[in-house]
Amino acid sequence: METLASLYNEHLSTLQQRTRDVLERHQLDALLIHSGELQRLFLDDRDYPFKVNPQFKAWVPVTEVPNCWLWVDGVNTPKLWFYSPVDYWHSVEPLPDSFWTKNIDVQPLLNADDIAQQLPVQRERVAYIGYAQQRAQALGFSAENINPQPVLDYLHYYRSYKTDYELACMREAQKTAVVGHRAAYEAFQSGMSEFDINLAYLMATGHRDTDVPYDNIVALNEHSAVLHYTILQHQPPAEIRSFLIDAGAEYNGYAADLTRTYAADRDSDFAALISDLNTEQLALIDTIKSGERYTDYHVQMHQRIAKLLRTHNLVTGISEEAMVEQGITCPFLPHGLGHPLGLQVHDTAGFMQDDKGTNLNAPSKYPYLRCTRVLQPRMVLTIEPGLYFIDSLLAPWRIGEFSKHFNWDRIDALKPYGGIRIEDNIVIHDKRVENMTRDLKLA
């Protein structure tokens, strides 16, 4: 923990420097960052599960406590008003005493509404960062100082460059997720249902289903052709052919996002396709380096998908280059190669080209690509190619001019398996790429 404490000190210094810069640029005195508020269900007396403001947990690893406030000016010790009411109806988090609290001025906030009296009176040049805009207005913040876009753009852009503390947290999240993936694979091997496989994952990771950074995707057979399948059938299918799991974990607010696909019959054609996609994914990662645009690797992955379509006799009589040019690979790989990862699963600034918020959109041919950045050291991204058999995407190709090149009998034979996705989390360094997932031997 001493090591994490020293890394956090450096992390805090980096955030303070960024804060000084953004305040000076926009003639502000401070930022007031709100953890968030509970949101009440309509016509009910219960609340939705609390999800913290990512800009708040960038500063402090407080992820489950609403009504907290952080005052930062880039110079003085950050001040945290920590919500700690007297309450016998609900459990209350005690005032934190951890590796990070020596660097933060932590003050208890007994009542959520008391923050108005706690804040400095002069706050005309203070920006509110959070989603409770009505609360900010009640505190006297002007509209232009509630989530000002230029400030958010600056903060989002530099969140792409992870500090050593953030990388350490993300490696810990990887460890937890890998434990869960191994438990889920064992559950799949024993013939469990999607629902029970998910329970095995949660048990192994120590997460509740509201704690994971995104809804776990646990898909058997053709369900894995639904990219964000989250139904979780309670009964296993009569025949189990394949298993796709896309599930992550969190550590101090930082996410892991991993996907693996398995065939029940290791000697099947589908198993061979999984193996070859795995080979192509690793080969692509071996080519990734700082200074190159992420979009280029997405296009290269489509070239590799074309190779697989040819070698597995799924598309014939047309060159790999023509497959990519004509978009034949797109119904098989309809999503992007991956996305930035960090405090959020789909982390901010994937399209942002500078700290002023200049965006470069995804190419029109690949509209679901989530990152167009030039890769730089300290960026963390997912690499998650897929190869799916999705009826709705393949249907137009059955009647088009290129239909004759599709081996429909073979495609239809693989449709009951759903699809494949293989996802690793990588860190860009100066002279190498760190594969956090494979470093933990998750095959």
From Swiss-Prot:
Record-linked Gene3D superfamilies: Creatinase/methionine aminopeptidase superfamily, Creatinase/prolidase N-terminal domain
Keyword Protein transport part of the UniProt annotation: no
Entry GO CC: cytosol
GO process annotations (BP): proteolysis
Catalytic activity: Xaa-L-Pro dipeptide + H2O = an L-alpha-amino acid + L-proline
Its EC number(s): 3.4.13.9
One Pfam family this sequence matches: PepQ_N
Cofactor: Mn(2+)
Example GO molecular function: aminopeptidase activity
EC class of the enzyme, as a word: hydrolase
Job description of the protein: Splits dipeptides with a prolyl residue in the C-terminal position.
Organism: Yersinia pseudotuberculosis serotype O:1b (strain IP 31758)
Similarity annotation: Belongs to the peptidase M24B family. Bacterial-type prolidase subfamily.
Residue positions binding Mn(2+) 2: 246, 257, 423
Textual note on the cofactor: Binds 2 manganese ions per subunit.
Keyword field: Dipeptidase, Hydrolase, Manganese, Metal-binding, Metalloprotease, Protease
Name recorded for this polypeptide: Xaa-Pro dipeptidase
NCBIfam families per UniProt: PRK13607.1
Residues annotated as binding Mn(2+) 1: 257, 339, 384, 423
Domain of life: Bacteria
InterPro entries found in the cross-reference section: Creatin/AminoP/Spt16_N (IPR029149), Creatinase/aminopeptidase-like (IPR036005), PepQ_N (IPR048819), Pept_M24 (IPR000994), Peptidase_M24B_aminopep-P_CS (IPR001131), X-Pro_dipept-like (IPR052433), X_Pro_dipept (IPR022846)
